[in-house]
């Protein structure tokens, strides 16, 4: 009997629109591009040999729009009758939780940082800097709020009200999807939302996570959800098409996959330098609303 395949899709780093990118020159970390991940989910849906997906999420979030795009792609994949199981890494917060919310099951380690269900947004006003440097700036626009995000001036009252509504609507959309995906009442979600951060164990106690377990536990759960019997051989398939234009899939061995999915305590990170922080936020340039942890937790 031919083996059944369980696909592994990585959501690692800052969630952005467009293609995924590798680590920056100064250690700013890689990005999980919604376009890349959507392509991988579509490929997994269309391959008959693939019976389930394990979504490995290690991300503090990023673009709210990109997170919603990935959430929709996960839901579309599930409508094909194939399950999605999430395996959380060291951090799966804000947008990282958004993309996980509708999974058939969510696994986290007891020390995973997750939750942070909330959105932030705003803009930098350079008006004072321009005045100090003697720079004259003329703005031509058409329409009441056409220049709302111009850096040459702060929000006026009307623009602020419009942007505040946009933030509130996005937050409501986020919490609604958590409520549906986790079979929770809206009031229950509010008690754990509003940006609150939880450990994996605390998240399980609050129904944000199903089980405490590692990557192999998530794979076994995907096998069960897909109805693959214990006597059937299962092969893991790493869907990796970064840098390709044809969406081709590379199949890596279990050893290679496990090396990629080392526990957080065995991964080396370098995101503490100012240049790394600059790279991190540069990747979110142009995004108006963010589903991202607005700080970095460092355990010493």
PLM region descriptions:
Residues 1-129, 168:
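Cleft-lining beta-strand/loop regions that shape enzyme active-site pockets
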């Amino acid at each position: 009997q031919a083996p059944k395949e369980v696909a592994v899709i990585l959501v690692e780093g800052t969630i952005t629109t467009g293609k995924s990118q590798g680590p920056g020159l100064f250690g700013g970390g890689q990005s999980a591009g919604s376009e890349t991940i959507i392509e991988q989910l579509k490929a997994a849906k269309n391959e008959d040999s693939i019976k389930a997906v394990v979504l490995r999420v290690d991300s503090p979030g990023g673009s709210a729009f990109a997170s919603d795009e990935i959430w929709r792609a996960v839901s579309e994949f599930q409508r094909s009758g194939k399950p999605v199981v999430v395996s959380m890494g060291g951090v799966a917060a804000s947008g990282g939780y958004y993309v996980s919310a509708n999974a058939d099951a969510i696994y986290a380690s007891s020390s995973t940082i997750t939750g942070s269900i909330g959105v932030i947004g705003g803009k930098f006003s350079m008006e004072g800097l321009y005045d100090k440097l003697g720079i004259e700036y003329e703005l031509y626009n058409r329409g009441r709020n056409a220049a709302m995000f111009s850096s040459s001036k702060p929000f006026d009252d009307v623009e602020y009200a419009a942007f505040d509504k946009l933030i509130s609507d996005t937050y409501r959309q986020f919490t609604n999807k958590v409520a549906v995906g986790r079979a929770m009442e809206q009031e229950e979600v509010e008690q754990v939302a509003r940006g609150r951060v939880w450990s994996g164990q605390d998240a399980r106690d609050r129904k944000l996570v199903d089980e405490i377990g590692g990557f192999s536990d998530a794979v076994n759960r995907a096998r069960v959800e897909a109805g693959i019997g214990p006597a059937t051989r299962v092969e893991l398939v790493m869907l990796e098409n970064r840098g390709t234009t044809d969406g081709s899939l590379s199949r890596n061995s279990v050893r290679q996959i496990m090396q990629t999915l080392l526990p957080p305590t065995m991964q080396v990170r370098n995101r503490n330098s100012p240049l790394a922080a600059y790279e991190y936020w540069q990747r979110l340039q142009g995004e108006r609303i963010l589903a991202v942890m607005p700080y970095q937790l460092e355990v010493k």
